[in-house]
Regions:
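Non-catalytic C-terminal accessory region of glycerolipid acyltransferases
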Residues: 3-8, 43, 64, 76, ...
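Soluble or luminal CAZymes and related metallo-dependent hydrolases
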Residues: 15, 50, 104, 179, ...
Length: 367
């Protein structure tokens, strides 16, 4: 019975998203924006698990001093921001490149474009802030012909195909997080060719992430971006995003250099910690635009489940390395240890949707 209900729910979810894409692109923008804001308000008032986790995460950001009422006001703004993200995702296919460029306020754009123009690749780790899909469409509109990212394969499969097609239609190259694709090898190839790779990195969805200090607590984050920078020599440039009134804001931060000393693992860990520090500053400046409705801090995690996930991740790495060795090596000719360094195979986070924001559990923070 549970499988039947799950299948029915999956079909309903896929149909809902298809309808949203069709409708939002056809109704007046002001109407659609109002509807999504109301949906965000309803989700916030329901105080489901997702909103409660959002408030728990925001408490780490703002500290103990703000009252419960002030924290609730912040989470309310956060759910409205999350609703705006979803509205804009559905609206992106009809937003012109001219508007994407005109309405973006970005610090550090020339830094990134200069790096790419020199022929050097760049890997951009980013948190689930603002509108990361819009930011991707914006960089394409700025003249970058294409960039590569990784996303989880959503369920049902029809929804996964739709999201892959949506992002590919915007100019993204999307690699599935599962399915036997040699992701690290492909990403490394793109970077060595002077390409751009963007990887959401503020939450470990694999169990194999790097432990970092984050707002004074332990958390696990994706280390794949740092591993790629160490492996390929690409520039590691963290990005933070936010909503700037009706416009969009972004900051492409200065490159995090590879440490001169230490083992490969130690270098990746140190660079990932620096990424976390950049994320801290960006989130603290715009906490309402951090759409983290899931557990991210170690204190909130089920440690038994985390240990099981880590064991699964290690087994997957070993299996992938053995398979690649049997086949003569990975796509980029790296060793099994190098390929295993891309610990955060996901990168994109599983789809929650705005409605699930009121009752989220262990899913991701967005597609």
């Amino acid at each position: 019975m549970s499988k039947v209900l799950s299948a029915v729910r999956g079909r309903v979810t896929a149909a809902s998203y298809a309808a949203a894409w069709w409708l939002v692109c056809r109704v007046p923008e002001s109407w659609g924006r109002w509807v999504f804001q109301q949906a965000g308000e309803i989700a916030w008032r329901r105080q489901g698990a997702g909103v409660q986790l959002l408030e728990a995460n925001l408490r780490r950001v703002v500290g103990p001093e703000p009252s419960g009422k002030e924290l609730r006001a912040l989470s309310r703004a956060g759910m409205h921001s999350y609703a705006r993200y979803w509205f804009e995702v559905f609206r992106l296919p009809v937003i012109s490149a001219e508007r994407l460029v005109a309405d973006m306020r970005c610090e550090g754009k020339d830094r990134l474009l200069g790096t790419l123009a020199s022929g050097r690749g760049a890997v951009l780790p980013l948190p689930h802030m603002g509108n990361w899909d819009q930011a991707g469409a914006w960089i394409i509109a700025c003249g970058v012909p294409r960039f590569t990212t990784v996303a989880e394969r959503l369920k049902p499969e029809s929804l996964a195909r739709r999201f892959f097609a949506f992002r590919e239609g915007l100019g993204f190259e999307v690699l599935p997080a599962t399915g036997g694709v040699q992701r690290f090898g492909i990403l490394a190839q793109r970077l060595r060719a002077g390409g751009l790779v963007c990887l959401p990195a503020d939450r470990d969805v694999t169990g194999g992430g790097i432990e970092v200090d984050f707002f004074g607590e332990k958390a696990h984050m994706m280390g794949g971006a740092a591993a790629l920078a160490v492996q390929t020599g690409a520039a590691l440039m963290p990005v933070t995003l936010w909503f700037d009134g009706p416009l969009w804001g972004a900051h492409i931060h200065e490159e995090i250099p590879v440490p001169g000393e230490g083992t490969r693992r130690e270098k990746v860990a140190a660079m990932t910690q620096q990424v976390a520090r950049v994320f801290e500053a960006g989130i603290a400046e715009h906490p309402e635009d951090w759409h983290m409705l899931q557990r991210v801090f170690a204190a909130d995690l089920d440690m038994a489940r985390l240990a099981a996930a880590q064991a699964t991740a290690r087994a997957a790495e070993e299996a992938e390395g053995a398979a690649a060795a049997a086949a003569g090596g990975a796509a980029d000719g790296r060793s099994a240890a190098d390929r295993a360094a891309l610990n955060g195979r996901g990168g994109g986070g599983a789809l929650d949707g705005l409605a699930d924001g009121a009752d989220a559990s262990e899913g991701g923070s967005g597609p």
